[in-house]
Amino acid sequence: MASSSGDDFVILVCTNLNPIEVEVEKDREILISTDDIQSWDLVTILRYQTVRIRAYRNRLTEQSSYFHGLLGGSFSESSLDNIVVQWNLETFLNILQCIYGCPLNVALNNFLPLFEGALYFGVEMLLEKCRAWFSEVFLSKNSGPPQIQCDDLIHMWNFGLENANDFVPELCARYLARNFMWAMSNRDFVNIPFNLLFECVKHPCLTVDSEMHLSDALLVWLDANTEQMDCSIRTKENLTGILKEIRISILPLWFAAGKRRSCYFSKLADESVDSILRLVKIPPTGSINALGDVDLNHLRIRLTEYSEKVDFSSRPQVTSAILLLSVLHSSHSMDSTLRKIIKKYLINLEHPDKDHWRISECLPPALSFEALQEVNISKCHRLHLEYAIECFSRSFPSLKIIKAAYLLNIKTTSFIKLVHKCPLVSEVDLSVDISPIIPTQVSVLSSNPALPLVSNKCWDVTSCYHSGTSLSNITYLTIEGRTDICDSDLEFISKYCVSLGYLNIKGCIAVTDVGISNVICRCIELHSIVVCDTSFGMNSILALCCAAPKFGNSTGHFGKRASNLQKLHMGCCKGVDETSLIELMSQTAMLKSLCLSDTHLVDEALYNFSGSSLETLDVSNTMISGAALAHIIRGNSGLKHLHARGCKYLFQQGSYIGGTEFSFSHPCKDLFFELGRTCKLEGIALGWGFSNFSLEALKPAIISLKSIAVGLGGTLGEDALRLLPTTCPMLELVILHFQVLLINKRYFVDPYDFEPICKHIGRLFIAMGD
């Protein structure tokens, strides 16, 4: 029907290809008008097969280039009253709402349809709205999980390419680059198109914890895609070219050496090993000049405005020069003058008496990375720690966690003083390997209860709250295995780190029971203590069982310190007698993790345990009975990890109490019954009394099991091993101690016998000893 000159509206006829399946009018058609657009009920409208929309021509031609050309041009449709629109009905209704000024929310679920519709119909207002939403989401600096999922990102990238829109692909590459650590753990990571991945890796916003993470991710992608695509040799070379974006000079040496057999990475691995060894030979103060006039970008640790964590642990090639290079802007020309200034500055760092601050004023200003919260410099033995902390304080103002494990070139107390320059740091890890130095039994020093405790001095801490003394914010301190730690160091820690909540001094064999008790008394916020293989003894137990004082204007006392404990690991602490353990267990109602292995633990202590929140329990190599263990399991249904290897009395009626040994009797069936009835275990370690029949009773409890260890006195035969992957579908680790395995009528010696099992289990260890 032709339009008369007096008519200023047109009927838009839309066919709904996917109407909502409900009863509607027999003609399945509805007429609506843009006059009522504010009150449109889309749910009702979308039930109809055909929707006729009465819309004004002028508004359509003003806001849509498509309708401007169609209705205002020389097309035959321009004179018609009815125009057929073939488009997704819901999307088209949303486009009309935007044209007529109705509020419209762009979201992840409708962005692509709206953007595509806005492009097709030429609605600039909607295009701007889509661009604004896309930019806000993709450029947002908000922390937390990404709003866009990996598969959605892939769809958006493909859409941008198909519609020749550079705006979308560019932001997709940037978004993937800044969220690369999240993307690489996503199951859709291997489905990312090569061009998107390549643009992401080249993008200056590429954010990774380390080059090792980037390398692993790219190798996983290549493994998945080159096999599926059955690529030619030339195509494979193009694909592996992406690996050249990896900064191979700052990979860990062990990682690079381990990749020499990779079909994609072997050549780069050799180059990486050579480069690392060359860097290690260069003195720390001369690492920049010795490299000549080459581009130094490959030595920069990857830092961006989105970096939250950086890990350059186990890299002996990392020095102060490389750290300095990484926090300077890449636009700075590394000419001979700047190189000389850097060299002089680094040399002066080795001589504290020299005024290196005056030289530092000649250095270009360092960048600030506001989002970075965690740094790992463990095993970086050639890194000047004083400069490193100074650098962190300037360039990482939000730093909260410093991991500096396996570094022996600085005293613990000195490092804690240095960390004070980073005011927000709350967690410090200075642990070292303890296995070579822990004796079979730690000698207990000063464990006589008659010796004076610090409890009468703990009020001195009050002055710290009101004086001008500058205190550390450290709440989480790990100094495991530090043999340089003595009582005076613990006293410094207790005075300086008054907010300490977590303390790990495992293997600190030079500290005494009195020294440990002083820390417990002073640090009233302690909720987690790891004191395995130390002189933790009677004084420390007394300190835990004493009431903690209140400070400030408050009066009275807090509850006893033990009542606040959530984690207590005191394995191999022989200085605690049975009576003290019984008293301690009666006061630890909040415990979630408890380790009492190799202690004088007896049944009465477990019967006196007042808690119901245990998630981890280790009673290995103790004298407890199965009945006592069943009792504690019965009251702690949330138990996830149980270690009871080496408990010889586990299947007797009782244990050693007061020097009396109970005679052997029938096995305690209650234990496995309670485990199967009460718990959902993730890890278990058992020995004496454990058998294939025990595994059957445990079935309900081990559906989610991830690790199992069987020790001396227990048996786990071939049949049970073969059933493990079925019984425990999530199992990752199996450890067998002192197990005699008879397979095919011969003693097990051939590793290929276990090949079918290892296909389903991540790791299998067979230990001949403890």
Task: List each model region and its residues.
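Conserved hydrophobic beta-strand positions in leucine-rich repeat
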Residues: 310, 375-378, 402-405, 425-430, ...
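Short active-site loop/helix that positions an aromatic residue
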Residues: 61-71
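Solenoidal tandem-repeat scaffolds enriched in leucines and small polar residues
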Residues: 154-207, 212, 219-225, 432, ...
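Alpha-helical scaffold in the C-terminal half of BTB/POZ domains
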Residues: 18, 53, 77, 93, ...
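N-terminal BTB/POZ boundary and linker segment
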Residues: 1-58, 90, 97-108
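Cytochrome P450 substrate-recognition site 1
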Residues: 70-82
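Short, solvent-exposed loop/turn at the beta-strand->alpha-helix junction
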Residues: 316-324, 334-335, 343-360, 381-387, ...
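A structural signal for leucine-rich repeat
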Residues: 322-331, 363-367, 389-395, 415-422, ...
